[in-house]
Amino acid sequence: MERNQRKVYTGRVVSDKMDKTITVLVETYKKDRLYGKRVKYSKKFKAHDENNSAKIGDIVRIQETRPLSKDKHFRLVEIVEEAVII
């Protein structure tokens, strides 16, 4: 699979407690087959963060990669928006 054909998702970091790993919540919409209403659903992905640069609440872009561990199949591409700490 070529590098440009790999899946790219944008989501919010919900956990950064692991070393060099973040958990990203990706929210998408599906259209209900019967009623046509848009239904929001979410999925969590573990992604490799080499420099531990992403923090909780950041909006990040992740890309599919080779399996790095049992659960980790994505890597951090960029931090789109940093979280505002109040």
Swiss-Prot record:
GO biological process terms held by the UniProt record: translation
GO cellular component, one term: cytosolic small ribosomal subunit
UniProt keyword RNA-binding, yes or no: yes
GO terms assigned for molecular function: rRNA binding; structural constituent of ribosome
Keyword presence, RNA-binding: yes
InterPro entries attached to this UniProt entry: NA-bd_OB-fold (IPR012340), Ribosomal_uS17 (IPR000266), Ribosomal_uS17_bact/chlr (IPR019984), Ribosomal_uS17_CS (IPR019979)
Highest taxon listed in the record's lineage: Bacteria
Pfam families: Ribosomal_S17
CDD domains from the UniProt entry: Ribosomal_uS17
Keywords assigned by UniProt, alphabetized: Ribonucleoprotein, Ribosomal protein, RNA-binding, rRNA-binding
Family that this chain belongs to: Belongs to the universal ribosomal protein uS17 family.
General function of this protein: One of the primary rRNA binding proteins, it binds specifically to the 5'-end of 16S ribosomal RNA.
Subunit (UniProt): Part of the 30S ribosomal subunit.
Designated name of the protein: Small ribosomal subunit protein uS17
